[in-house]
Amino acid sequence: MRRHSPDALRGLVESYLGELAFAPELGALEEVLRYPLESGGKRIRPVLCLAVGEAVGAEAEQCLPAAAALELVHTFSLVHDDLPALDDDDERRGRPSAHVAFGEGVALLAGDALLAEAFRLALSYPSTAAARELAQATLGMIGGQYRDVTGDTSDLAALHRLKTGCLFAASVGLALSVAEVAEREQAPWRAFGAELGLLFQIVDDVLDGDGYSERHGAEAARALADEAAARAQGRLEAIPADTSVLAEIVAGLASRTA
């Protein structure tokens, strides 16, 4: 079976999202949904989903609806996070945030619609397993955001396992669901998925100078990121499959500069 490179997988995701048909009931709101989707995100979560899918024997195209659903949930979270009631950010990826470009009420509705569209995609499979996986991840992400908003940051690892880690874990879990991997064979894959969110978040904090970096210092935070990357690579080495593309993705997560 063909294995795509991370860049090729990202190209598949971009094409799929660009051609994705939203519900006609949304009318002109579709423009607002596409605005944050087309703002140049890295697509790390859907690329991971496709790479895991290929590693367990599925075709990348088979996993595209699930991968796109992940990106829609992630984008929904960004649109809502930027609102004045939460992070109050006026800019996202070098452009005005959705609430600045279209108004708070419209941005709120766009986020709601992105979430609904994500579940429409997840429910396009014969089994409901993908939708259940996505629901659990979304609830975890929201729970982590609640901790952040209410200032419950005493346990950063627990917060980030929810806020960031749940969608990364779902990148793996959704691929396993779509490929119908037997539950008894899922444990090493899920152990790998559990490492990814923390790795991503620590590197994020090093780049932004907050979170782990602010609490422990930049050098110590960088060491934590290296340890997280080593754990993720170790999890991959324990999996009896061709995980070379995933190893490349993990290395990219650990060394990213933006």
Give the location of each predicted region.
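All-alpha prenyltransferase/terpene-synthase fold signal
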Residues: 1-258
